Regions:
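Short, glycine-/small- and polar/acidic-enriched structural segments
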Residues: 14-133, 137-144
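Short helix-initiation/N-cap motifs at beta->coil->alpha
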Residues: 34-44, 97, 135-149, 153, ...
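Secondary-structure end/capping motifs
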Residues: 226, 231-306
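Short hairpin/turn module used for nucleic-acid contact or packing/dimerization
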Residues: 296-324
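Short, well-ordered beta-strand segments
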Residues: 7-9, 108, 138, 182
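Extracytoplasmic "Venus flytrap"
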Residues: 6-16
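Immediate post-signal peptide segment of exported/extracytoplasmic ligand-binding proteins
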Residues: 1-7, 96-106, 280-281, 306
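Pocket-lining segment of extracytoplasmic ligand-binding domains
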Residues: 148-258
Length: 324
């Protein structure tokens, strides 16, 4: 019997590269892999269901599950993870020295419902007592104008939000002093250029992130992998095959990092970084599956509810195909 042909949309990570270059092949499946940035991929999957299998924003997936309108089934592949303490930028003249100083300030972000921003706001509320409604939000493109979110936010009335006009950008407003702070998933160019007017809220973000993980066990998950529900219903075995292949690809990527013969990545202290990661997160630091990721999954389910994107808190046990 011939293999099932499926499209897979994902970004070109070290942990997907073995799938892309053919070193790893899912059993019984021929993948037509479409490599694209998440900001292009996610709208195409959410609006058009364009791919049979796709990387997807975890926040969007949890929101749709909570609303009872999700056309996807997720596999417990936590494809993208990142701590977000480094992603909050402030004007040095805005009087913001602590997270609590963000109350009443004008803060920009590209999307309030994006997973990264949801995690940042969840951290603000649970770690520092700063709720979503304590801030005046401005939503728009970071360095170029952008359209409104794909998924309607349905924010509570108490949350104050303004959308940027067609000729405004978040970076431009921050540089001009029209914003006091920025929650940015990408490093702003004005910060990269060394503007003295822009600084990170947490200059010691690496130490903060390690402490946050030790206390909460949360390694924030940004993206998962989903299948269209019709594909899963017709071929439920596909979920297991996809999961196994992604695990094998990740193992090849991670195992290749610990090699002092010839460094796999262009980082001079790669081995030191890896050994420090083991000390903090353990050897299985990029674990897939429900059990090792439960703290982060419980957090995102709670945050999307608290921030008004979902009418209920979604349990981790609801998120993925069973028995995996």
């Amino acid at each position: 019997m011939s293999n099932l042909k499926l499209t897979l949309a994902c970004w070109d990570y070290d942990r997907t590269r073995p799938l892309i270059d053919g070193r790893v092949k899912p059993e019984g499946i021929d993948l037509d892999i479409r490599i694209m940035r998440p900001r292009e991929m996610f709208p195409r999957m959410l609006e058009k269901k364009e791919f049979e299998v796709s990387e997807l924003s975890l926040g969007s997936y949890v929101t749709l599950k909570g609303r009872g309108s999700c056309p996807f089934v997720a596999v417990p592949i936590t494809l993208s993870k990142i701590f977000r303490h480094s992603c909050i930028y402030v004007r040095t003249d805005a009087g913001i020295k602590t997270p609590q100083d963000l109350r009443g300030k004008r803060v920009g972000t590209t999307q309030l419902g994006s997973t990264g921003t949801v995690f940042m706001n969840g951290m603000m509320q649970h770690e520092y007592g700063v709720a979503l409604e304590d801030i005046h939000w401005f939503i728009g493109g970071l360095d170029s104008p952008t359209s409104r979110p794909v998924i309607a936010l349905n924010l509570p009335e108490k949350v104050k939000v303004d959308f940027l006009s067609s000729n405004q950008t978040l970076e431009g407003m921050l540089e001009a002093g029209q914003l006091d702070a920025l929650f940015a998933l990408y490093i702003p160019s004005i910060f990269q250029k060394g503007s003295p007017r822009i600084a990170r809220l947490f200059p010691n973000y690496s130490e903060r992130e390690r402490d946050y993980y030790r206390r909460t066990r949360i390694f924030p998950i940004m993206h998962t992998v989903v299948m269209r529900e019709d594909v899963y219903r017709q071929n439920p075995w596909v979920a297991g095959s996809i999961y196994k292949a992604f695990c094998e690809a990740r193992d090849l990527a991670v195992d290749g990092l610990y090699d002092t013969d010839a460094l796999r990545l262009s980082l001079p202290w790669l081995i030191s970084h890896l050994e420090e990661t083991w000390r903090v997160l353990g050897k299985d630091f990029w674990a897939y599956g429900l059990k090792p990721n439960r703290p982060a999954l419980e957090a995102i389910g709670q945050y999307v509810y608290e921030q008004g994107f979902s009418p209920r808190a979604v349990s981790p046990d609801e998120l993925f195909v069973p028995d995996m």
